[in-house]
Protein backbone atom coordinates (compact mmCIF):
# COMPACT_ATOMS: atom_id res chain seq x y z
CA UNK A 1 0.00 0.00 0.00
CA UNK A 2 1.44 3.37 -1.03
CA UNK A 3 1.78 5.90 1.79
CA UNK A 4 1.17 9.62 1.31
CA UNK A 5 4.91 10.25 1.63
CA UNK A 6 5.78 7.70 -1.07
CA UNK A 7 2.99 9.07 -3.29
CA UNK A 8 4.47 12.55 -2.88
CA UNK A 9 7.94 11.30 -3.78
CA UNK A 10 6.58 9.43 -6.78
CA UNK A 11 4.77 12.49 -8.12
CA UNK A 12 7.78 14.77 -7.59
CA UNK A 13 10.32 12.36 -9.07
CA UNK A 14 8.32 10.87 -11.93
CA UNK A 15 5.59 13.33 -12.85
CA UNK A 16 7.58 16.52 -12.50
CA UNK A 17 11.35 16.06 -12.44
CA UNK A 18 11.63 13.31 -15.03
CA UNK A 19 8.83 14.43 -17.34
CA UNK A 20 10.06 18.02 -17.49
CA UNK A 21 13.78 17.15 -17.43
CA UNK A 22 14.40 19.33 -14.38
CA UNK A 23 18.09 20.10 -14.01
CA UNK A 24 17.81 21.56 -10.48
CA UNK A 25 15.54 19.13 -8.59
CA UNK A 26 16.45 20.59 -5.19
CA UNK A 27 15.10 23.98 -6.28
CA UNK A 28 11.91 22.40 -7.59
CA UNK A 29 11.34 20.60 -4.30
CA UNK A 30 11.88 23.83 -2.35
CA UNK A 31 9.36 25.65 -4.55
CA UNK A 32 6.86 22.83 -4.14
CA UNK A 33 7.33 22.81 -0.36
CA UNK A 34 6.84 26.59 -0.29
CA UNK A 35 3.59 26.38 -2.28
CA UNK A 36 2.20 23.54 -0.16
CA UNK A 37 3.11 25.19 3.14
CA UNK A 38 1.58 28.47 1.98
CA UNK A 39 -1.66 27.09 0.55
CA UNK A 40 -4.39 29.75 0.13
CA UNK A 41 -1.93 32.63 -0.12
CA UNK A 42 -0.93 34.88 -3.01
CA UNK A 43 1.74 33.52 -5.35
CA UNK A 44 4.76 35.73 -5.94
CA UNK A 45 7.63 34.42 -8.04
CA UNK A 46 9.76 37.19 -6.58
CA UNK A 47 9.07 36.08 -3.00
CA UNK A 48 9.73 32.44 -3.83
CA UNK A 49 13.00 33.33 -5.58
CA UNK A 50 14.00 35.39 -2.53
CA UNK A 51 13.28 32.50 -0.17
CA UNK A 52 15.45 30.23 -2.32
CA UNK A 53 18.24 32.79 -2.28
CA UNK A 54 18.02 32.85 1.52
CA UNK A 55 18.50 29.07 1.39
CA UNK A 56 21.57 29.51 -0.86
CA UNK A 57 19.73 28.39 -4.01
CA UNK A 58 19.60 30.95 -6.81
CA UNK A 59 16.76 30.52 -9.31
CA UNK A 60 15.58 33.13 -11.81
CA UNK A 61 12.01 34.46 -11.80
CA UNK A 62 11.11 32.84 -15.16
CA UNK A 63 12.40 29.48 -13.92
CA UNK A 64 10.28 29.81 -10.77
CA UNK A 65 7.17 30.35 -12.89
CA UNK A 66 8.11 27.43 -15.15
CA UNK A 67 8.41 25.19 -12.10
CA UNK A 68 5.07 26.42 -10.74
CA UNK A 69 3.46 25.53 -14.08
CA UNK A 70 4.93 22.02 -13.91
CA UNK A 71 3.62 21.61 -10.35
CA UNK A 72 0.13 22.78 -11.34
CA UNK A 73 0.14 20.38 -14.31
CA UNK A 74 0.97 17.53 -11.89
CA UNK A 75 -2.25 18.33 -9.95
CA UNK A 76 -0.53 18.95 -6.62
CA UNK A 77 -1.38 22.64 -6.58
CA UNK A 78 -4.22 24.64 -8.15
CA UNK A 79 -3.65 28.23 -9.22
CA UNK A 80 -6.67 30.56 -8.96
CA UNK A 81 -7.18 33.88 -10.72
CA UNK A 82 -8.48 37.02 -9.07
CA UNK A 83 -11.66 38.54 -10.46
CA UNK A 84 -12.39 42.25 -10.27
CA UNK A 85 -16.04 42.29 -9.20
CA UNK A 86 -16.55 45.94 -10.01
CA UNK A 87 -14.75 45.80 -13.38
CA UNK A 88 -16.14 42.33 -14.16
CA UNK A 89 -12.90 40.90 -15.47
CA UNK A 90 -10.25 38.36 -14.49
CA UNK A 91 -6.91 39.80 -13.39
CA UNK A 92 -3.62 38.36 -14.61
CA UNK A 93 -1.79 38.99 -11.34
CA UNK A 94 -1.98 38.24 -7.61
CA UNK A 95 -3.12 34.66 -8.18
CA UNK A 96 -3.57 32.35 -5.20
CA UNK A 97 -2.56 28.71 -4.92
CA UNK A 98 -4.29 25.86 -3.10
CA UNK A 99 -2.88 22.44 -2.32
CA UNK A 100 -5.08 19.71 -3.80
CA UNK A 101 -4.58 17.31 -0.86
CA UNK A 102 -4.37 18.65 2.70
CA UNK A 103 -2.32 15.58 3.63
CA UNK A 104 0.54 17.20 1.72
CA UNK A 105 -0.03 20.39 3.73
CA UNK A 106 0.26 18.47 6.99
CA UNK A 107 3.54 16.94 5.75
CA UNK A 108 5.11 20.21 4.66
CA UNK A 109 3.53 22.93 6.79
CA UNK A 110 5.83 25.46 8.42
CA UNK A 111 3.36 27.73 10.17
CA UNK A 112 1.12 27.67 13.21
CA UNK A 113 -0.50 31.13 13.15
CA UNK A 114 -3.98 31.07 11.57
CA UNK A 115 -3.39 27.49 10.46
CA UNK A 116 -7.06 26.51 10.81
CA UNK A 117 -8.19 29.46 8.71
CA UNK A 118 -5.90 28.32 5.89
CA UNK A 119 -7.04 24.70 6.22
CA UNK A 120 -10.73 25.61 6.10
CA UNK A 121 -10.24 27.94 3.13
CA UNK A 122 -8.44 25.14 1.27
CA UNK A 123 -11.16 22.62 2.19
CA UNK A 124 -13.88 24.90 0.88
CA UNK A 125 -11.96 25.57 -2.34
CA UNK A 126 -11.35 21.87 -3.03
CA UNK A 127 -15.01 21.05 -2.34
CA UNK A 128 -16.19 23.71 -4.78
CA UNK A 129 -13.88 22.31 -7.46
CA UNK A 130 -15.16 18.77 -6.75
CA UNK A 131 -18.72 20.04 -7.30
CA UNK A 132 -17.80 21.41 -10.70
CA UNK A 133 -17.57 25.12 -9.96
CA UNK A 134 -15.22 27.50 -11.74
CA UNK A 135 -13.63 29.39 -8.86
CA UNK A 136 -12.09 32.85 -8.65
CA UNK A 137 -10.77 35.04 -5.85
CA UNK A 138 -12.98 38.13 -5.63
CA UNK A 139 -11.39 41.58 -5.62
CA UNK A 140 -13.36 44.58 -4.38
CA UNK A 141 -12.30 48.16 -3.80
CA UNK A 142 -12.30 47.37 -0.06
CA UNK A 143 -10.41 44.11 -0.17
CA UNK A 144 -11.13 40.50 -1.03
CA UNK A 145 -13.91 37.92 -1.20
CA UNK A 146 -12.51 34.44 -0.61
CA UNK A 147 -14.38 32.80 -3.49
CA UNK A 148 -16.59 33.56 -6.45
CA UNK A 149 -17.92 30.18 -7.58
CA UNK A 150 -19.67 29.84 -10.93
CA UNK A 151 -21.66 27.18 -12.74
CA UNK A 152 -23.01 27.74 -16.27
CA UNK A 153 -26.23 29.30 -14.98
CA UNK A 154 -25.42 30.41 -11.45
CA UNK A 155 -22.94 32.25 -9.25
CA UNK A 156 -22.31 32.40 -5.50
CA UNK A 157 -19.93 34.20 -3.16
CA UNK A 158 -18.25 32.52 -0.18
CA UNK A 159 -16.25 33.75 2.79
CA UNK A 160 -14.55 31.17 5.03
CA UNK A 161 -13.23 31.36 8.58
CA UNK A 162 -12.35 29.07 11.48
CA UNK A 163 -14.62 30.47 14.20
CA UNK A 164 -16.74 33.62 14.39
CA UNK A 165 -15.81 34.09 18.02
CA UNK A 166 -15.30 37.84 18.23
CA UNK A 167 -16.86 40.97 16.80
CA UNK A 168 -13.82 41.79 14.65
CA UNK A 169 -14.00 38.42 12.87
CA UNK A 170 -17.76 38.69 12.39
CA UNK A 171 -17.41 42.16 10.92
CA UNK A 172 -14.51 41.10 8.67
CA UNK A 173 -16.33 38.11 7.20
CA UNK A 174 -19.81 39.59 6.79
CA UNK A 175 -18.49 43.09 6.10
CA UNK A 176 -16.48 41.83 3.12
CA UNK A 177 -19.78 41.85 1.22
CA UNK A 178 -20.53 45.52 1.88
CA UNK A 179 -18.96 46.48 -1.45
CA UNK A 180 -20.70 43.73 -3.45
CA UNK A 181 -23.95 45.19 -4.74
CA UNK A 182 -25.43 42.42 -6.87
CA UNK A 183 -28.06 39.90 -5.77
CA UNK A 184 -26.19 36.62 -6.11
CA UNK A 185 -26.26 34.38 -2.98
CA UNK A 186 -23.61 35.14 -0.37
CA UNK A 187 -22.32 32.77 2.30
CA UNK A 188 -19.98 32.65 5.29
CA UNK A 189 -18.70 29.16 6.15
CA UNK A 190 -17.06 28.41 9.51
CA UNK A 191 -16.67 25.69 12.15
CA UNK A 192 -19.18 27.32 14.51
CA UNK A 193 -21.73 24.71 15.68
CA UNK A 194 -24.43 27.39 15.88
CA UNK A 195 -24.73 29.72 12.91
CA UNK A 196 -26.43 33.08 12.52
CA UNK A 197 -27.37 34.73 9.21
CA UNK A 198 -26.99 38.49 8.77
CA UNK A 199 -28.43 40.95 6.24
CA UNK A 200 -29.40 38.17 3.83
CA UNK A 201 -25.96 36.53 4.05
CA UNK A 202 -26.21 32.88 5.07
CA UNK A 203 -23.87 31.50 7.72
CA UNK A 204 -23.16 27.77 7.29
CA UNK A 205 -21.33 25.22 9.40
CA UNK A 206 -18.39 23.69 7.50
CA UNK A 207 -19.39 20.07 8.15
CA UNK A 208 -22.96 20.73 7.01
CA UNK A 209 -21.59 22.38 3.86
CA UNK A 210 -19.35 19.39 3.10
CA UNK A 211 -22.12 16.84 3.67
CA UNK A 212 -25.01 18.59 1.91
CA UNK A 213 -24.55 19.97 -1.60
CA UNK A 214 -28.03 21.50 -1.49
CA UNK A 215 -27.09 24.04 1.20
CA UNK A 216 -25.59 26.37 -1.40
CA UNK A 217 -27.54 27.35 -4.46
CA UNK A 218 -27.10 29.94 -7.17
Give short role names for the model-derived ranges.
Residues 2-155:
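Accessory nucleic acid-recognition modules appended to NTPase machines
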Residues 138, 162-207:
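Catalytic cores of nucleic-acid endonucleases
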Residues 89-90, 145-148, 196-199, 213-215:
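Short, solvent-exposed polar/charged micro-motifs at secondary-structure junctions
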Residues 107, 176, 209-212:
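Generic recognition of well-ordered alpha-helical segments
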